Amino acid sequence: MKFSDFSVLGLGALALNAVTVSANTADTALLRTYSTISPSLSEIESAASATEVAEVVSDVEGAAFKRFFIIFLENTDYDKAAGDESLSWLAEQGITLTNYWALTHPSEPNYLASVGGDYFALDDDRFISMPSNVSNIVDLLDTKGISWAEYQEHSPYAGFQGMNFSNQETYASDYVRKHNPLILFDNVVNNDTRLANIKNFEDFNNDVENEKLPQYAFITPNMTNDGHDTTIQFAGKWSKDFLAPLLENDYFMEDTLVLLTFDENETYGIKNKVFSILLGGVIPDELKGTKDDTFYDHYSQLASVEANWDLPHLGRHDGDANVLEIVANATNITNVEVDTTYMINETYIGYLNDYNIELPAPNVTAINRNGQPILDSIKETWEDEYSKQVSESYYTSTTTTVSADVTDAETFSNFYRYRQC
């Protein structure tokens, strides 16, 4: 498909309605606010004793892999991560992605976008909840019965919705909601079956031991192990200690692809490229220790899942994102070269930082990289609103990567073509 298939508006609408701004300039009085869930310890303990944990498995064939596990580390500049001894060891076991980009700052919008195809102008880490008419990767996976889960280290129980859960001995920050992407969606938390798939690391260990792993999983270490409250050396060592035994586990490795990446870089004033590695049993020996220079970003996670299992799309930035090369090669998809000259960290005024702005409608007419239309249920929900927004020239791009200093119209419009939906 052409990327212009995902573009709904022209440069004029951009100039009128999509002024990019620095993250700290949004008017806090206009922020959409939500009631924070902060249960007491006794309430948490009571809920934990009554919570059921899902064990859902499936065996759906994929073009390049049968299982895809994503692990997010935290807040590290590319060069620092690339220079870490433990991460360098892991890189020798797989493929280093030298041109993989986070989307914005701070953490939470990157997590949100990785499963939802958009971060809806979120520019902080506050408590949010996306309404039930906003879909995510789970809706796509469910169309083919592809099992999925999240594994959140030290979450007190499956489906915990609280803002955080501290270490009960040291009271240090431990589990945090902002690093749990699927818990941010009402169509997950209001569905008990889905909620039971939001598990913790004890459940992960059990699922490995019992050979009950899902086919898709998002894995988040706690605030110590992911490097947020420690160092890249600490996070790198944790990553090696966590992954090295799994790389020797025949059950885990079979037909599995692992993406180890970072939510964002640390230094906001430089480009938001993050160190990333592909690992797993689907990596052929001849590619171990190699590098892939293709442009990817967090939306490539969604695009790769869609292409691997030939799924429909969400109508957001999943539809035009580059696909991981191991999947692209298996599906005859040609990735595009992306000019990263103006990839800097800017945000924009939109749904989550201005309550006067409507939710951007997904593009219900587009075709994704693997030739599939939008998910039928999304089209049914959003078709009228999409037509309305297009007729009103409502701009729906969520790019954060265009320099605010760019004034050349041709450069500006060509860059935005890649990131309009």
Swiss-Prot record:
Reaction equation(s) it catalyzes: a phosphate monoester + H2O = an alcohol + phosphate
Any one GO molecular-function label of the UniProt entry: acid phosphatase activity
Active site (UniProt): 229 (proton donor)
One GO BP: phospholipid catabolic process
Domain of life: Eukaryota
Entry EC number(s): 3.1.3.2
Enzyme kind, highest EC tier: hydrolase
InterPro entries: Alkaline_phosphatase_core_sf (IPR017850), Phosphoesterase (IPR007312)
Keywords for this protein: Hydrolase
PANTHER family in the record: ACID PHOSPHATASE PHOA (AFU_ORTHOLOGUE AFUA_1G03570), NON-SPECIFIC PHOSPHOLIPASE C4-RELATED
Protein name: Probable acid phosphatase
Organism: Kluyveromyces lactis (strain ATCC 8585 / CBS 2359 / DSM 70799 / NBRC 1267 / NRRL Y-1140 / WM37)
